[in-house]
Amino acid sequence: MKLTCVLIIAVLFLTACQLTTGETYSRGEQKDHALRSTDKNSKLTRQCTPVGGYCFDHHHCCSNHCIKSIGRCVAH
């Protein structure tokens, strides 16, 4: 019985938190948050290295192929 009461109170508390958070974002703050997130992602995005460029790992190459022995991106 005590466990049931604790679970009901926890669910009500979490529901109240969700409603409060949803109300905050519906006032226009969500738009600003989305813009900040986009700016942050664009700073973290790296451009790939073209074919013939230097590479250390295949993930850096636009073609996804790096010959590590010569350190160059190659075409697939």
From Swiss-Prot:
Q: What tissue specificity is annotated for this entry? A: Expressed by the venom duct.
Q: Which residues carry this modification: Pyrrolidone carboxylic acid?
A: 47
Q: Which keywords does the record carry?
A: Disulfide bond, Knottin, Neurotoxin, Pyrrolidone carboxylic acid, Secreted, Signal, Toxin
* Pfam families for this protein: Conotoxin
Transmembrane stretches in the record are none
Task: List the GO terms this entry assigns under cellular component, sorted alphabetically.
Answer: extracellular region
- Cite a single GO MF annotation: ion channel inhibitor activity
Q: Which residues form the propeptide?
A: 23-46
Region forming the signal peptide: 1-22
Q: Which cysteines are joined by disulfide bonds?
A: 48-62, 55-66, 61-73
Q: Where in the cell is it found?
A: Secreted
Q: Which family does it belong to?
A: Belongs to the conotoxin O1 superfamily.
Cite the domain annotation text.
The presence of a 'disulfide through disulfide knot' structurally defines this protein as a knottin.
Q: Quote the protein name from its UniProt record.
A: Conotoxin ArMKLT2-032
